[in-house]
């Protein structure tokens, strides 16, 4: 399991953004719990052969798929494509396949997550933003065991579904 190359060197501004994410994320989780916040997101499982691409955010320890919030007026697929471009620099007319949805209570909010799959013969050079996304790795199925993963990724992979969560 090795880190995939980053596109550019980290700057002082990048470090400030990472600090803002690390401070802001726990505060946002408290806010979501207090407001009983609902959220809709889209995540993309990127496969290169049997390996799966996972990304690490600057503000959490778990690994995740590229993806994020579905904005108002945006379809889940549009959100998935936008997030791929923003987080890892992957843009283009590649075939995203919708593979299902999951609902759960993650990070203190009720979350509906739309899952997509993208299958590639080879991984193009990734352009990590060095602010929100700080690492990306291709992981073999055997390496997934014991890794810290976000709740939605664990559900996608068929791990034990926590109480209050379900998938379709």
Please give the residue ranges for each predicted region.
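Acidic, metal-coordinating catalytic segment for phosphate/diphosphate chemistry
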Residues: 2-43
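Nudix hydrolase/Nudix homology domain
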Residues: 4, 61-62, 130-168
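Short secondary-structure boundary/capping segments
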Residues: 36, 44-45, 106-107, 125-130
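Conserved Nudix-box catalytic region and its N-terminal flanking loop in Nudix hydrolases
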Residues: 42, 47-86
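Short loop segments at secondary-structure junctions
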Residues: 49-51, 119-124, 141-143
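A short coil-to-beta-strand element that immediately follows conserved catalytic motifs
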Residues: 91-101
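Active-site-adjacent beta-strand/loop module that shapes the phosphate/pyrophosphate-binding cleft
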Residues: 102-125, 137, 160
């Amino acid at each position: 399991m090795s880190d995939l190359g980053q596109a550019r060197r980290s700057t002082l501004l990048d470090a400030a953004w990472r600090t803002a994410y690390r401070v802001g994320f726990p505060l946002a989780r408290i806010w979501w719990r207090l407001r009983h916040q609902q959220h809709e997101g889209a995540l993309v499982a990127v496969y290169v052969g049997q390996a799966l691409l996972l990304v690490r955010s600057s503000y959490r320890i778990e690994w995740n798929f590229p993806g994020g919030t579905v904005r108002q007026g945006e379809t889940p697929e549009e959100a998935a494509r936008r997030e791929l471009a923003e987080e890892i620099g992957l843009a283009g007319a590649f075939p995203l396949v919708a593979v299902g949805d999951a609902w759960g209570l993650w990070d203190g909010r009720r979350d509906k997550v739309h899952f997509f799959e993208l299958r590639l013969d080879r991984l193009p050079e990734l352009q990590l933003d060095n602010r929100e996304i700080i690492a990306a790795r291709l992981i073999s199925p055997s390496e997934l065991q014991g890794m810290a993963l976000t709740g939605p990724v664990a559900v996608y992979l068929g791990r034990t579904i926590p109480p209050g969560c379900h998938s379709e």
